[in-house]
Amino acid sequence: MAHQKEQRTFALIKPDGVQRSLIGEIISRFERTGLKFVAFKFLVPTREQCFAHYAKDDAWCVKVGERTITGKKEKGLPVEKSALEYGRDILEGNVRFLTSGPVLAMCLEGNQAVGIVKKLVGGTEPLTSDVGTIRADLTIDSYEIANADDRCVRNLIHCSDEPKEAERELKIWFKDGELISYHHINEVTLYDVDLGHILGK
């Protein structure tokens, strides 16, 4: 079993993050925490890759579809489809957006990497995400505007929610051997039990 400081997580800068030239800003925020990158991949995803990534079944589609129906009723808008159909439309919209242009897939490693990256990224909706997070600081989209325009919310980046999800997603986006194991000088400062030999004491 790997040491906690070797935990790995997955993050993906979406097409809107790439098009707004925010790759450097986002990467620097991750690096400043002390996490290290062990893989990058710049690509235009396939539909198959995206459906595997989202891994949503009909139960999920019904659940989000029901929320869509509730929202339409609250606004006095007509309900023209079933919850399942609305949910499938949402999933299709997510896939269509993710395949619309280049993305940057990343693997980061370090102590509590999953939780650290999730904290930096912020909540799914930029409008309500905590101040200081990537989504709150770098974009102003909201569910309300996205729903009105019949599109997915543009929130710049995806990250894994938990370690098992990170393991699953990394296998979708990276092949065996593409995750690089190496020593980074920062690890000595972050994790070494005794800094005396570094500080000359």
Give residue spans per PLM region.
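Non-catalytic terminal and connector segments of soluble metabolic enzymes
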Residues: M1-K201
